[in-house]
């Protein structure tokens, strides 16, 4: 892409339906090429899986927001793991600093129309401590599977990312053979390259990054349910989380 969507004026429909997904694909691709992405392992195979919570809902972000936000966190060097929209931040007693840009994402309303919003980290607010203090009280998801560990066994994007996202949400350790991580990179790269093409030049045989993240998020829910059952974690708690999270999970990024 030779244009910056955040500097080039475009129609709202084009911005929502094309620029944001393409930007996400660009961020993913650059991260993989530099071997610097939140879901990639270090030389020992260890992956630092950390949740990022939506202060409004109290839950870890779904995949289509979580990973783009994690990329932004890595790039900007933020320490906080709580984000919120501009209006929600106002409700927490502070405001977004002038000139700060959030992480854009798309969602569909009940009528099917695509809208755009953005999320900001605590460090991007005028009073980060007040925001974090008040937002933390709303966080419902804790590291209920802390102490559990998983080794990613598949290089298929849905399975690989699904396992990583499950670790972020469940608070458990995750690792992978670096060679398998390389296989994952080679399998998801065609999708990223396809998403960066003009809309009418894209292959319909390849899934979009948005669809992969959507399926990976569903897979993470299945993994968490399976681990919870085998580990004896309160199933009522797990079901409540799934029910509360369902609407947000279904908001695909297009």
Question: Where do the protein language model's features map onto the residues?
Answer:
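N-terminal accessory/interface modules of nucleic-acid-binding and processing proteins
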Residues: 1-253
């Amino acid at each position: 892409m030779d244009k910056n969507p955040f500097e080039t004026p475009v129609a709202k429909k084009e911005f929502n339906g094309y620029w944001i997904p393409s930007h996400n694909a660009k961020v993913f691709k650059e991260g993989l090429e530099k071997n610097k992405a939140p879901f990639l392992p270090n030389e020992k195979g260890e992956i630092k899986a950390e949740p990022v919570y939506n202060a409004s809902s109290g839950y870890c972000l779904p995949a289509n927001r979580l990973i783009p936000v994690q990329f932004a966190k890595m790039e900007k060097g933020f320490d906080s793991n709580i984000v919120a929209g501009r209006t929600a931040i106002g409700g927490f007693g502070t405001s977004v600093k002038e000139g700060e840009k959030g992480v854009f994402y798309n969602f569909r309303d009940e009528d099917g129309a695509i809208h755009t919003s953005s999320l900001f980290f605590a460090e991007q607010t005028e009073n980060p401590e007040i925001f974090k203090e008040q937002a933390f009280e709303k966080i419902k998801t804790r590291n209920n599977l802390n102490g559990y560990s998983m080794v990613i066994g598949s290089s298929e994007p849905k399975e690989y990312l699904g396992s990583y996202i499950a670790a972020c949400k469940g608070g458990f350790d995750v690792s992978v053979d670096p060679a398998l991580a390389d296989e994952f990179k080679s399998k998801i790269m065609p999708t990223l390259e396809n998403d960066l093409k003009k809309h009418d030049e894209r292959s319909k045989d390849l899934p979009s990054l948005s669809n992969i993240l959507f399926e990976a998020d569903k897979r993470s829910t299945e993994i968490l349910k399976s681990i919870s059952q085998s580990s004896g974690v309160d199933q009522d708690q797990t079901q409540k989380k799934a029910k509360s999270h369902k609407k947000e999970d279904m908001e695909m990024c297009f």
